[in-house]
């Protein structure tokens, strides 16, 4: 699997990189939404872990950008966030074709990896 992590927290990206590569998967990371969009345009990913709360260009901005370019439905996005978004707001986001799940931080890393593998296999 080729997984993209978009998160402004370098420590989280380092942890994800370590665990995901130990499981035998490829991991690419972006520290902000703009870099994440650029990577999505250049490569194909089996899954995208997307933080909602990032400065300057948030996860919501990433989702809107993908919607406008008609690329959202092609993605398998797992919202991975400590955002204060309500369950109702998350439910609205999950109605978008490319958004498959939401996991709130903090999370057991094994639960996260299992969710990523489940989302990838589900299509």
Segments predicted by a language model, with ranges:
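Receiver (REC) domain active-site loop signature in two-component systems and cognate sites
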Residues: 54
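Alpha4 helix (beta4-alpha4-beta5 surface) of REC/receiver domains from two-component response regulators
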Residues: 61, 84-101, 110, 114
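Two-component/phosphorelay signaling modules centered on CheY-like receiver
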Residues: 10-28, 96-97
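Hydrophobic/aromatic residues positioned on beta-strands within the core alpha/beta folds
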Residues: 80-82
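Short amphipathic alpha-helix used as the core "switch/output" element in two-component signaling
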Residues: 38, 60-73
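Helix N-cap/capping motif at the beta->alpha junctions
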Residues: 29-38, 59
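His-Asp phosphorelay/catalytic-motif detector in bacterial-type signaling
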Residues: 44-46, 70-78
């Amino acid at each position: 699997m080729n997984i993209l992590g978009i998160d402004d927290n370098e420590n989280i990206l380092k942890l994800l990189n370590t665990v995901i590569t130990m499981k035998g998967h490829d991991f690419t990371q972006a520290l902000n939404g703009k870099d994440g969009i650029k990577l999505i345009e250049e490569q194909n990913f089996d899954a995208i872990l997307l933080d909602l709360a990032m400065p300057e260009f948030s996860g919501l901005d990433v989702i809107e950008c993908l919607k406008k370019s008609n690329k959202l439905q092609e993605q398998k996005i797992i919202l991975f966030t400590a955002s204060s978004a309500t369950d109702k707001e998350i439910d609205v986001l999950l109605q978008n074709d490319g958004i498959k799940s939401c996991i709130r931080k903090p999370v057991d890393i094994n639960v996260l990896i299992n969710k990523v593998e489940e989302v990838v296999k589900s299509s």
